[in-house]
């Protein structure tokens, strides 16, 4: 099974059109999707998971928008598969050169060692790594994650590593590498196998420049 050609983002407001246009030049033949909070709740209603009821209530139980976005990306990717990218990140290469035939990929964080940068994740539907992350998040109270903001990033890294130790090994997976260069504007993300910068995360002011390569 291959990663479906679905490219999804979420934020309260729709991204500016120039940003969507930039993305679409890198995702030809892919379907671009964006969800705001109301659309996320509708998605939960239209795509229920019987074992995980009352997902809208769980969504609103988190104080931070970042954690609500985490829950949605896990849920969407578990249901449909595809690629999720944060709205403060931008592709520099054609998405197909990253996805290839992987069943799961994301980014190894250099800023928070032992965690995954969840701003860029791709996987097949019902992927076991994402399934574990979704169930773990569903069962984690808001009070716990308030005290450990990057808990889900850490747990996703653990689930990725655990996958190597289980009988049903998801061998066709990959982590890109975020570089820690003390850049005050963005963090570059590299495909270290090919020594190519594939994505930039504009973590500082969260503004995507118009003049990217």
Residue spans of the language-model regions?
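Small-residue hinge/turn detector
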Residues: 70-82
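Glycosyltransferase-associated regions of secretory-pathway enzymes
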Residues: 1-69, 85-213
């Amino acid at each position: 099974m291959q990663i479906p050609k679905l490219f999804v983002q979420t934020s309260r407001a729709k991204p500016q059109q120039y940003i969507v246009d930039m993305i679409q030049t890198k995702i030809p033949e892919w379907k671009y999707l964006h969800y705001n909070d109301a659309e996320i709740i509708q998605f939960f209603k239209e795509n229920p998971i019987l074992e995980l009821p009352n997902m809208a209530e769980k969504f609103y139980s988190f104080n931070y928008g970042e954690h609500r976005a985490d829950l949605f990306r896990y849920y969407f990717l578990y249901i449909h598969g595809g690629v999720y990218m944060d709205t403060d990140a931008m592709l520099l290469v054609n998405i197909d050169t990253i996805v290839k035939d992987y069943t799961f990929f994301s980014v190894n964080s250099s800023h928070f060692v032992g965690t995954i940068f969840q701003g860029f994740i791709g996987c097949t539907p019902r992927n076991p790594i994402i399934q574990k992350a979704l169930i773990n998040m569903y069962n984690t109270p808001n009070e716990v994650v308030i005290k450990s903001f990057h808990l889900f990033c850490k747990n996703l890294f653990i689930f990725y590593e655990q996958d190597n130790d289980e009988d049903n090994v998801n061998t066709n997976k990959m982590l890109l590498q975020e570089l820690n260069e003390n850049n005050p504007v963005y963090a570059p993300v590299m495909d270290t196998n090919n020594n190519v910068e594939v994505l930039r995360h504009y973590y500082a002011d969260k503004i995507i420049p118009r003049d990217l390569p």
